[in-house]
């Protein structure tokens, strides 16, 4: 079984969803992967990876708004605030989502649905760079 490793660096600003589908497809094409599994992971405790609709940007807005209501930033019960008011909410939101995704590659093509995209979910406001492996 062939195994390759790569890092993808994404520069970010604020809480948002950053799509990285195109960069992933480009990496698959550049490395001529025909068939197999792609395992993506993020080595941060305040960000996550999701597969989500990429056709309508309102989906991203609604997801962010929902998570902000579910896990509010200014909760007086949070004890852990080492990195600011968004620190503990970021940890909770990342615990509710994924830090790893496994996807299939068939005939050199990433198998995603018509409207699916790969997203880095930025939960922590202040970190400017994220690395995916």
PLM regions and their residue ranges:
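Active-site beta-strand/loop microenvironment that shapes enzyme catalytic pockets
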Residues: 16-63
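A generic structural signal for short beta-strands and their flanking turns/coil linkers
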Residues: 4-6, 34-38, 43-47, 99, ...
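Low-complexity, intrinsically disordered Gly/Pro/Thr-rich segments
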Residues: 113-123
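Single conserved hydrophobic/aromatic residue that forms the stacking wall/gate
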Residues: 123-133
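Short amphipathic
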Residues: 2-12
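Mid-chain, well-packed structural core segment of small domains
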Residues: 68-113
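Short beta-strand segments
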Residues: 41-43, 106, 121
């Amino acid at each position: 079984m062939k195994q390759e490793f790569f890092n993808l660096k994404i520069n970010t600003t604020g809480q948002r969803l950053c799509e990285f589908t195109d960069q992933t497809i480009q990496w698959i094409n550049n490395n001529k992967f025909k068939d197999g599994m792609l395992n993506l992971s993020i080595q941060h405790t305040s960000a996550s990876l999701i597969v989500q609709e990429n056709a309508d940007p309102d989906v991203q807005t609604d997801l962010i708004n929902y998570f902000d209501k579910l896990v509010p930033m200014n909760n007086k019960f949070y004890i852990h605030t080492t990195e600011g008011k968004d620190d503990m909410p970021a940890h909770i939101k990342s615990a509710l989502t994924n830090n790893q995704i496994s996807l299939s590659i068939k005939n050199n093509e990433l198998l995603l649905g018509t409207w699916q995209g790969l997203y880095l979910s930025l939960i922590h406001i202040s970190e400017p760079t994220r690395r995916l492996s």
